[in-house]
């Protein structure tokens, strides 16, 4: 069984990687990925684009000499390594909480590693390959998982405690830089897990907590001393808060919470639409109650594995094998279908094993003692923490609270494993992991195939056959012929009109920072989005007025989402169109959007 599981897991990882591979050197989106590149290549750390994530992506981008294909590749490798580390942390729990005290063999651990690494590739389902704030948030959540799990079992050495606590603190810091709400939530959740779930003595838990706090404070101190000073950091988050609450959609924090709760309330119906009633199959473990007690563990393991396999087959048969265009948005609901199946199995197993002991459970008034004394309930706590991490990763996303969790599919898969282990104990880990490896691997591969076939606001990889220079640093990417013509015409028209690298550009299109990045334009110190003249004026008010008086304009005439320049350029002491002349009109092939480049007239 181990050999079969490993062979299947390796095959699915290779297949998923093959579906992702073209994305590294093919295609680029001037909207989202344009923003990611501008933020990672900003002139200084004081440039803020809804958070400080670009500051911490810049060293990675610089490491590969601003080569976009290599930057994407190293991002995928780092995410896979973080997923592998999270799987190793889960393996520590398997060993520490096993009934025999020995835990799984190397084959089972290797299978868990492959499951996590393959599931992490689901982050790229939309084929947005360039590292971003989402990438940092997921990386942080995986590092938190890798650091937290070993701290839930008795310590093997002080050195290991230091390492695990340090990784946990680093994960919270990285997650915070990706999404501040995620970083805060990860830190608070980890503290609760240490206090309530860890099997360590109070002294050891206190020591681990102090190490986490100390390392976290050291990271914050290093940031304030070496990266960005206190006043600039506060200003950066002030601007981030402005965009989070007063931006183009006018969302307040309360609005985001309300939207998230609304999507959660609709989750059961969406899961039912994706998987039918198959997730209820996990409750069939209750049938094991009719068997002799010595046969129940084997029956529970078999029923749990079979239920997960059937749910996976139902979902993938409906949505996955063809790599359908909508499959990426289906993936989080598929993850929750598996999660509900494992939850039903775990609750059923607990009903069989724990109901006779109910009086003992009720007599306990210390939740921490209860969680620490019963391995099955500890697995429930671990699964809950992983699901909450996925939710924190997705909170505040424009893609929707639940749909955004497609990127955190790896956390939902690990939570499913934890709940399945609550049902089967670690003795059933191998069987469960073989099924999860196949089900999750097929889902991720299908998601990536869907992304590869579609392309994200650009030509699909198989149509991207012409090399184009998409960066003022000379980085090249293979794009569709019409996209290559756009970049070529943009460069020639701008150069002929006298544009030089470092010239400011006021981007009043719906959202196309990649165009300015290709030209080498000086970006604003604060993100300017289309849709809202007040936000654009607010951003311009923070620029050097003398320098930006000579800024060029990038417009999208005819777009209902662009900004009317007559309502904005007064912030730099000009009027439109009297003070400008059009020098280029180009069509971006995606959605055939027309872009116009306007040069300021000499005084």
What is the predicted function of each stretch?
Residues 208-293, 309-318:
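Membrane-lumen/periplasm interface segments of specific transmembrane helices
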Residues 17-37, 45-60, 65-69, 230, ...:
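Extracytoplasmic catalytic/substrate-binding loops of multi-pass membrane glycan-assembly enzymes
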Residues 185-221, 291-294, 422:
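Perimembrane helix-loop-helix junctions
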Residues 73-106:
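Transmembrane-helix motifs of polytopic, lipid-linked glycan transferases
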Residues 161-180, 185-191, 216-219, 386-395:
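Membrane-interface alpha helices of multi-pass inner-membrane proteins
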Residues 444-533, 551-562, 586-591:
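Short periplasmic/luminal acceptor-recognition loop of GT-C membrane glycosyltransferases, typified by
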Residues 551-603:
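Aromatic/acidic, Gly/Pro-rich catalytic loop(s) in extracytoplasmic/lumenal soluble domains
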Residues 136-156, 164, 411:
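Specific aromatic-rich, kink-prone transmembrane helix
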